[in-house]
């Protein structure tokens, strides 16, 4: 059964993950009226994907290496529904998740859920089987009101009017991470309330760096405008690690972070997480 809400996701290269996400949406007890896929790149054969359960709209954003904020804003602007659910392309939704999200969603609310992590990208989507493979069980505790400090944008539902009132994601924050922190801070400043439902999502595995040294330039370049707005640097734990390893200046907290050197190939490999612990 279709309900009047839209889903937005953005993608760059993760075709198999996107196919799995679509499969999980199709298996939901209620499905969106539309899925908006924003491709961070030019059209390709996969950007013709369709579904028998809901309408898939394909949009395109090019010109930057990783135009995350622009892509998300493009997706939200294309939504025809009052309620919009943003989902990271790596996520698989629990069959009853949308029911729970919509039962809570409304003006002034941001609704999210808990995340459990899969060790692989599955060949077939069967949520009841896959949830048993996840690193941690999906939490069953429902927090009615929470601070936005730990909010992650992997999945959230918001009213389109509330998103528009914030003017979406700030496109001055390019690339990874800092734009998410800014969006959460602006939601909190606007008086929105964060709710968490317990149905959960599963995150399909992909290699990553911890700390995210592959996004060193994004974090450093976005640090100053974030501090100018909020009075503190974002991702201070990452900046501390970057300084410890000599990639940025030691006195970054006083004079602002600056790139001192680029990580070596050996250093990059040492921080690569290639499997789920």
Task: Please describe what each predicted stretch is.
Residues 96-127:
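Conserved donor NDP-sugar-binding/catalytic core segment of glycosyltransferases
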Residues 23-32:
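Short, acidic, metal-binding catalytic loop of nucleotide-sugar glycosyltransferases
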Residues 63-79:
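Glycine-rich, basic loop-to-helix element that forms the pyrophosphate-binding segment
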Residues 114, 129-149:
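Short, flexible, basic/aromatic active-site loop/helix in glycosyltransferases
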Residues 1-24:
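N-proximal low-complexity "stem/linker" segments adjacent to membrane-targeting elements
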Residues 155-158, 162-167, 173-198:
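A short, conserved alpha-helix in the catalytic core of glycosyltransferases
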Residues 197-213, 225-226:
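Active-site donor/metal-binding and catalytic loop motifs
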């Amino acid at each position: 059964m279709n309900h009047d809400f839209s889903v937005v996701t953005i993608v760059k290269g993760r075709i198999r993950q996107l196919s799995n996400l679509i499969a999980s949406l199709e298996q939901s007890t209620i499905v969106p009226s539309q899925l908006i896929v924003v491709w961070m790149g030019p059209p390709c054969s996969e950007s013709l994907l369709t579904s028998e359960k809901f309408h898939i709209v394909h949009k395109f954003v090019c010109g930057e290496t990783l135009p995350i904020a622009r892509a998300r804003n493009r997706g939200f602007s294309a939504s025809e529904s009052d309620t919009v659910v943003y989902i990271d392309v790596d996520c698989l939704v629990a069959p009853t998740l949308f029911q729970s999200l919509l039962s809570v969603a409304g003006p002034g609310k941001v609704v999210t859920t808990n995340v459990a992590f899969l060790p692989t990208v599955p060949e077939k989507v069967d949520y009841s089987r896959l949830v048993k493979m996840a690193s941690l069980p999906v939490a069953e505790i429902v927090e009615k009101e929470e601070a936005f400090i730990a909010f992650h944008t992997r999945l959230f539902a918001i009213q389109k009017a509330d998103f528009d009132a914030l003017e979406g994601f700030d496109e001055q924050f390019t690339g990874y991470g800092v734009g998410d922190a800014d969006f959460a801070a602006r939601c909190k400043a606007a008086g929105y309330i964060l709710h968490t439902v317990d149905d959960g999502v599963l995150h399909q595995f992909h290699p990553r760096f911890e700390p995210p040294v592959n996004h060193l330039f994004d974090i450093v370049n976005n640090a100053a405008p974030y501090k100018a707005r909020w009075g503190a640097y974002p991702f201070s734990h990452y900046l501390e690690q970057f300084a410890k390893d000599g990639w940025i200046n030691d006195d970054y907290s006083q004079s602002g972070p600056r790139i001192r050197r680029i990580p070596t190939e050996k250093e990059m490999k040492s921080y690569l997480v290639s499997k789920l612990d």
